Amino acid sequence: MMKDKNIGDVNFIDRNVLTAVLREAERRGLEVRFILMGGSLSEGLASSASDIDLVVVHDGERKSNNIVMIVEGVKVEATVFGQQDFSRIIGMGRQGAAGAAYFWQLDARRRLLFSRPIHGHDAYEAQFRQARLDDFVADLAEFQKSLAIKSFSDVKGAFDDALHEDDLRIRCRIHLEHSVDLLLSSLGDYYFREKYRMARIRRSLKGDCLALVEDSISALLSGRMPAGGGSTSLSAWSGQVFAYSSLCQYLAAFSDFWSGWLTVGDVERFLQKPVLESPVGIFLFDKDVLCQSRRAAFKIPTAFANAMALTLLGFSEVRVAEGIEAYARYESARGRDEVVPGNLLQRKLEEIMVKLGV
């Protein structure tokens, strides 16, 4: 493994690695359409234990061997696809396979969809943006259905028909594992995780956003409370599980699969206990969507506030109304009653719901 370079050093990849790969592709006569950082077949399936894994997609249909090279002491491997082969893998669905092949297909598709383009971004986005959204929503819906959770804001609904406590704890852990997986995928974190450690939650949670939740999530997955405090009763523990699950899904849904829209401070404020226990309101704020609780707020571009994701995440009309009312009280306490006058609250809510399509 490389000693002096950080695989998360995007500048090094953009400046040195990308240049070398493009030069080699040109030498082979390949017209490169786009290049992804960390890709579907790179982990565990690459032919060598490389330090940096890329996927190169070219406009031709002929096969080409992988690109393997050393760049400033760093081992780089790029899996090369023709456009037709790449599209075929992206087109794989949840049907027609069973057992290990089923999971391989989904994993290959997902990692290709959620890898970060470092070259040809516009071409990649134009072709696969909707597929990424569809894949994310399908995953979210499937897990919501399998766990019989009415919404992510209604934890109690999962426990009304009481099962054995051990079974409920297992279901909660699976739910949190999936939420973490969604967030890792959305941040392109397949690239940063430990190589060849295929167990989903044994990967290393790296990056600014994930570093803040790594210890807490690890504790919850081990059946403990974050920071070693509080009761480990099912109700207390599951409440934290669903709080962190909702956070991971929320960040994944609205980051547009990029971490750049959220700062470490945003996540840190969101993770404060009073914030986790308060409903989050979502409403328009100028050209952005403002996400507001009593203790934290951050803005998201409206293009990323997908109506279906809002619904699946449990942001019903009631929750949006609660958020607006909480925001109005918050501003009123600061002497800014004019921000959301009470008599405009219902009209504002209706406008928001129409614009968000909920």
Spans of model-derived segments:
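Short aromatic-enriched loop/helix-cap "lid" or pocket-rim segments at secondary-structure transitions
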Residues: S48-A49, I90-M92, E194-R197
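Ordered hydrophobic segments in well-structured contexts
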Residues: R33-M37, V55-V57, D288-L290, A297-K299
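Conserved NTP/Mg2+-binding pocket subregion across the NTase superfamily
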Residues: M2-N6, N16, I67, V74-D166
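Catalytic metal-binding acidic patch
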Residues: I35-F81
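Long, charge-rich, low-complexity alpha-helical segments
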Residues: A297-V358
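Conserved nucleotidyltransferase catalytic core and NTase-mimicking acidic/glycine-rich helix/loop elements
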Residues: A138-D286, C291-A296, T302-F304, M308-L312, ...
